[in-house]
Amino acid sequence: MAIDVKAIEEHIRGILIALGDDPEREGLKNTPKRVAKMYEEVFKGMCYSNDEIAEMFNVTFEDDLCINDNENDMVFMKEIEIFSHCEHHLALMYNMKVAIAYIPKKKIIGLSKIARIADMVGRRLQLQERIGSDIAEILQKITGSEDVAVIIEGEHGCMTTRGIKKPGTKTITTTLRGRFNTDPIVSNKLMMLYTK
C-alpha cells in the first residue's frame, strides 16, 4: 500500500480551515505539503504487512554454537529507541524503549535487523500492545523460534498533553511467547537482564 501524499495535503489544508486559520497565510502556505511529507516518513511501516517486514529483514545466520547446548541461552537487546502514533488520537508515543529477547533455534538474526524491525513496526498507527505483538510475530517468522519476548516502555501524548494531562506517565507492556510465558527460569532470566 502506498501512502497518498496528495490526499494528505488536501485534508491537512481542510483541517487548517476547520481550525479557523488561513492556509494561504505566510506561515502555513507549505504546511500541508510538509505534514504530508512527514506523514509519509513517520508512517512508512503502514506500507508493509508483518509478512513483508519479515521478508525484508530475513537475514539469518546458522547458529552452530548453541544448538541444543543450553536451551535457556537467549539473545537479549534493550534500550532500542522508537516512536509511534496512537491510532485513537494520532498522538505521538515517545520516549519508547524496546527490549527484545529470543531463544535461537538453529538460526540467529543480525542485531541491526532486530532494531530495524522495531523501528518499522512503530511507524504505523498503533497500540503499544500491538507493537510488541507485531515485533514478536515477525521475529518468530524469521528465526523459527517460538520463544520471543518484547517489553516496551513509553509515554503517550494522549495521556500527557490532553485529557488527563499526566506528564511523565509511563506505560509498560509485555509480549511473552513460548517459554518466556511458560518457563519460570527463562522468564526470571529475562527480567533479571531487563532490570540490570
Curated annotation (Swiss-Prot):
Xref: InterPro entries: GTP-CH-I_C/QueF, GTP-CH-I_N, GTP_CycHdrlase_I, GTP_CycHdrlase_I_CS, GTP_CycHdrlase_I_dom
Superkingdom per UniProt: Bacteria
Keyword Metal-binding: yes
Gene Ontology molecular function terms on file: GTP binding; GTP cyclohydrolase I activity; zinc ion binding
Pathway the protein contributes to: Cofactor biosynthesis; 7,8-dihydroneopterin triphosphate biosynthesis; 7,8-dihydroneopterin triphosphate from GTP: step 1/1
One GO CC term, this protein: cytoplasm
EC number of this enzyme: 3.5.4.16
Keyword Repeat: no
GO biological process terms held by the UniProt record: one-carbon metabolic process; tetrahydrobiopterin biosynthetic process; tetrahydrofolate biosynthetic process
Catalyzed reactions: GTP + H2O = 7,8-dihydroneopterin 3'-triphosphate + formate + H(+)
Pfam family membership, one: GTP_cyclohydroI
Binding site for Zn(2+): 86, 89, 158
Keywords linked to the UniProt accession: GTP-binding, Hydrolase, Metal-binding, Nucleotide-binding, One-carbon metabolism, Zinc
Subunit structure: Homomer.
Stated family: Belongs to the GTP cyclohydrolase I family.
Protein name, per record: GTP cyclohydrolase 1
Annotated organism of origin: Clostridium botulinum (strain Kyoto / Type A2)
